Design a protein with these regions (language model features):
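Short beta-strand His + acidic residue motifs that chelate non-heme Fe in jelly-roll/DSBH
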Residues: 49-51, 69-70, 87, 92-99
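Glycine- and acidic-residue-biased ligand/ion/polar-headgroup-sensing regions
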Residues: 45, 55-73
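Conserved short histidine dyad/triad with adjacent acidic residue
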Residues: 23-26, 37-54, 89
Length: 115
């Protein structure tokens, strides 16, 4: 068995990335030639990301609560635990918690991007 202990504390999400209170725990950081990064992102009720894109796309996996997401020009979609959402490369989108519910997700993207 190998246990890799976390060496970082929970970070408050930056105000220019999020509206409302959002907290981030790093899950995977790039090693060697990898460009993979992942984070566990905790959204308080009504908190969400700003509109944004990822040049290589982004996958989120809802682990707890009820969330919402939207791509530009599309309807707001409700997402729940077990739902996986893939945003296409360059697709303008946002994601976050429903107005009255917490939501936690695992976000994955290139390490040079926010997750």
């Amino acid at each position: 068995m190998q246990i890799t202990r976390s060496s970082t504390d929970t970070q408050k999400g930056p105000a220019d990335w999020f509206t409302g209170d959002v907290y981030i725990d790093a899950v995977a950081a790039p090693a060697g030639t990898s460009t993979f990064a992942a984070a566990l992102v905790h959204f308080t009720p009504g908190a969400r990301t700003a509109w944004h894109t990822h040049p290589h796309g982004q996958t989120i996996f809802v682990t707890e609560g009820v969330g919402r997401c939207q791509r530009e020009g599309g309807p707001i979609e409700v997402i729940r635990p077990g739902d996986r959402v893939f945003f296409e490369p360059g697709e303008n989108h946002w994601h976050g918690a429903a107005p009255t519910r917490l939501m936690t997700q695992i976000g994955r993207a290139s390490c040079r991007e926010r997750v």
